[in-house]
């Protein structure tokens, strides 16, 4: 649904790419995550980091991203570095640069905090990371001004039990994979969804 104000401001974008205006409190603390050590990923990280700094917002990176071998900190003015497990608790918005795998990897650390995630696609498919790298700074400014559409994703909660004892529990975005480990052999398991046998 496009309005005339959006059309005037964004004439070069296709209608399906326009964000709808949803006014929300401003995002002030922006997390930035990336997983692959490819130069293309770090180029986008630097571009986004500089956009965040230009807007006088707080830039926060997780340790794993900060330690990417191709990331040059002389190209980034100000950044706070925290443990990955804390980034969802501290940030109002997290930007993930990479492919869908990077988004899924980040979701592991972010899911319990319900922090919004913006994916910049440096992978192949981009079902989850749908912002193109050459549009990243522009789209980020739109989001930070309140022009965006929030897409809620369902989360899976998974428990592994031995009898009544829970031996592992976790959250997942797309799927849960059960496997026997390093050696390939049959495994016996019972699966329930919402307490019902499947």
Place the predicted regions along the sequence by residue.
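ATP/NTP phosphate-donor binding region
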Residues: 1-93, 134-149, 160-170
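Gly/Ser-rich helix-loop-strand patches that form or flank binding pockets
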Residues: 109-127
